[in-house]
């Protein structure tokens, strides 16, 4: 069993914002696998999928971004998962829009959702799919991550979301994250 977590803010006003890229990844992943987020447990919307005979739990925390760990830890405990079994999809300002960077571990890098997960699971050693949202040019970081993409940026983002879903599929199919990293980084 594996768990895929998409980070974002659940309120309608945040849909389509840069900070919700993690939600966009898991929403597309679930849609492409014919599922939906039809369960709610431990401050999360949940989709349970079976891919190649393996149960895949996909979650969107309903906490605010900065409290994501409060949703992730109880679900890990409930499903008896370790950090080896989970992957977190989130936005990254240090990458150009739509670019991917897969990592096996690392610091929060200023991302408060990741910081919360590290705090609640007690380690930095969990997989991540980081999707670029670019750096703010002339606005504050808060205003930037809560802003929406331009039409031109949406096309680049769409390519990134497609590649992120392909990376998740690769990880599930081959169960070898190092090879997935080599293919998608």
From Swiss-Prot:
It comes from the Bacteria. InterPro entries: Pept_tRNA_hydro (IPR001328), Pept_tRNA_hydro_CS (IPR018171), Pept_tRNA_hydro_sf (IPR036416). GO terms for biological process: protein quality control for misfolded or incompletely synthesized proteins; rescue of stalled ribosome. GO terms for cellular component: cytoplasm. The record marks 9 as: Discriminates between blocked and unblocked aminoacyl-tRNA. It is found in: Cytoplasm. It is an enzyme of class 3 (hydrolase). TRNA binds at residues 14, 64, 66, 112. The keyword RNA-binding applies. Pfam families: Pept_tRNA_hydro (PF01195). The active site is at 19 (proton acceptor). NCBIfam families: pth. Belongs to the PTH family. Monomer. Hydrolyzes ribosome-free peptidyl-tRNAs (with 1 or more amino acids incorporated), which drop off the ribosome during protein synthesis, or as a result of ribosome stalling. Catalyzes the release of premature peptidyl moieties from peptidyl-tRNA molecules trapped in stalled 50S ribosomal subunits, and thus maintains levels of free tRNAs and 50S ribosomes. This is Peptidyl-tRNA hydrolase. It comes from Ligilactobacillus salivarius (strain UCC118).
